[in-house]
Structures are given as structure tokens and as C-alpha cells.
Amino acid sequence: DPSGSPHIRILPQETFEDICRLPSDSGDCLRFFEMWYFDGTTCTKFVYGGYGGNDNRFPTEKACMKRCAKA
């Protein structure tokens, strides 16, 4: 974008919820980042390699629960 404005992508509600149904995916690299994913019931810690993977990946348990836990 020549204007230099950031791009904002709006996800449909079903896509938003589907992210939380994806399996944990450590990605394609061999680095070691402790991250959190939603396992269908709760948020669980896993090791992320730093590249690739899917969007069911959060920096904190709180961020994971906020996004995926049902009230």
C-alpha cells in the first residue's frame, strides 16, 4: 500500500472460533519459545519453533483464555 497505512483484516466469526480448534503446531524452525494453545478445553503450554505453525498460538495463558475460552 503506497499510503503506508497498516492493513487491518476482519475475520468472520466462524474463522475467529475455528482458530481455537486448530491443533498445536510447533512450526518449522528449531528455536524455543514457550507459547500457549487452546486444546478444546483449556489453554496448554507448548514449544513454538519461531516460524510457521498456525494461529492457535498465544504469548500468555491469559491471552489464550481471553480469545478461546467460552464464558
UniProtKB/Swiss-Prot annotation:
Record keywords: Disulfide bond, Protease inhibitor, Secreted, Serine protease inhibitor, Signal
Gene Ontology molecular functions: potassium channel regulator activity; serine-type endopeptidase inhibitor activity; toxin activity
Compartments (UniProt record): Secreted
UniProt-annotated site: May bind Kv1, residues: L22
Full protein name: Kunitz-type serine protease inhibitor HNTX-852
Paired cysteines (S-S): C20-C68, C43-C64
One BP term from GO: envenomation resulting in negative regulation of voltage-gated potassium channel activity in another organism
Start and end residues of each BPTI/Kunitz inhibitor domain: 23-68
Statement: the UniProt record of this protein carries the keyword Signal: yes
Tissue-specificity statement: Expressed by the venom gland.
Signal peptide, first to last residue: 1-22
UniProt-annotated site: Reactive bond for chymotrypsin, residues: L30, R31
Family: Belongs to the venom Kunitz-type family. 03 (sub-Kunitz) subfamily.
KW Disulfide bond (keyword) present: yes
Top-level taxonomy: Eukaryota, Metazoa, Ecdysozoa, Arthropoda, Chelicerata
Pfam family, one: Kunitz_BPTI
GO cellular component, one term: extracellular region
